[in-house]
């Protein structure tokens, strides 16, 4: 049997895996256990009551967290004309059409989000094999294919998170950094849960949000008692 590290022993002794923690208690515990030499992200896993094998029950979308994610996001935008100027004014680091596509084909991938206006999809479509595996392909379902590219850039910069359930019906995303104020993490979590509720497939039956767990980059998962969250989110 593998020997537990000191960090793993502390987590084992501090975290009750059978308990659902009040949100404030959960965040305090995460902060206590976050001992890495960098500022860890606070990640969330939401188990949904869906049948992920059925395409009409899959959940996908995006929402802007009220307090952002704490990450600096670099944005590439495929567009032209007035939209190109608007994207630059909104803070996009890379803006173009065929010229931007050529950069990407050469392996120049210095961005975290790709946005495209509908008329640019003829160019972006050629990059599916490059952008797709990295989760960067623009998609109207998450607001990254839009005629209003400036708004999409603003959302990305403001802390928009994208979510999509995995094959087990679980959503994985981040809600901030461990050095965020506890109330900001709580409000970010509540905003995400509200967005997930709005995205509930009509075919999903029974309990929809079955379990919510928080963890830090290097830490263990802590189950959250949903009754302590804002009524709109639970």
Curated annotation (Swiss-Prot):
Lineage: superkingdom: Bacteria
UniProt-listed InterPro entries: Ribosom_uL1_bac-type, Ribosomal_uL1, Ribosomal_uL1-like, Ribosomal_uL1/biogenesis, Ribosomal_uL1_3-a/b-sand, Ribosomal_uL1_CS
CDD domains per record: Ribosomal_L1
Entry GO CC: cytosolic large ribosomal subunit
Molecular-function GO terms, alphabetical: rRNA binding; structural constituent of ribosome; tRNA binding
Pfam families: Ribosomal_L1 (PF00687)
PROSITE patterns reported in the protein's UniProt record: RIBOSOMAL_L1
Keyword Hydrolase annotated: no
NCBIfam families: rplA_bact
Function statement: Binds directly to 23S rRNA. The L1 stalk is quite mobile in the ribosome, and is involved in E site tRNA release. Protein L1 is also a translational repressor protein, it controls the translation of the L11 operon by binding to its mRNA.
Protein name per its UniProtKB record: Large ribosomal subunit protein uL1
The organism of origin for this protein: Pectobacterium carotovorum subsp. carotovorum (strain PC1)
Gene transcribed to yield this protein: rplA
């Amino acid at each position: 049997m593998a020997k537990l590290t000191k960090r793993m022993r502390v987590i084992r002794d501090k975290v009750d895996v059978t308990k659902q923690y009040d949100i404030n208690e959960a965040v305090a515990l995460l902060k206590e256990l976050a001992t890495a030499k960098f500022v860890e992200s606070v990640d969330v896993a939401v188990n949904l009551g869906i049948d992920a094998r059925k395409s009409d029950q899959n959940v996908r979308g995006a929402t802007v967290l009220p307090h952002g994610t704490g990450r600096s996001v670099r944005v590439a935008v495929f567009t032209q004309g007035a939209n190109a100027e608007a994207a630059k004014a909104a803070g996009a680091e890379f803006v173009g059409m065929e010229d931007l596509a050529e950069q990407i084909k050469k392996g120049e991938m210095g961005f975290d989000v790709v946005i495209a206006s509908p008329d640019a999809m003829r160019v972006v479509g050629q990059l599916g094999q490059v952008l797709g595996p990295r989760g960067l392909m623009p998609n109207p379902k998450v607001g990254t294919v839009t005629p209003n590219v400036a708004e999409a850039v603003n959302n990305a910069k403001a802390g928009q998170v994208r979510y999509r359930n995995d094959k087990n019906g679980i959503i994985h995303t981040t809600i901030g950094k461990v050095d965020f104020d506890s109330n900001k993490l709580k409000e970010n979590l509540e905003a995400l849960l509200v967005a997930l509720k709005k995205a509930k497939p009509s075919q999903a039956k029974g309990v929809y949000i079955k379990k919510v767990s928080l963890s830090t980059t290097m830490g263990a998962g802590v189950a959250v008692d949903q009754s302590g969250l804002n009524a709109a989110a639970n």
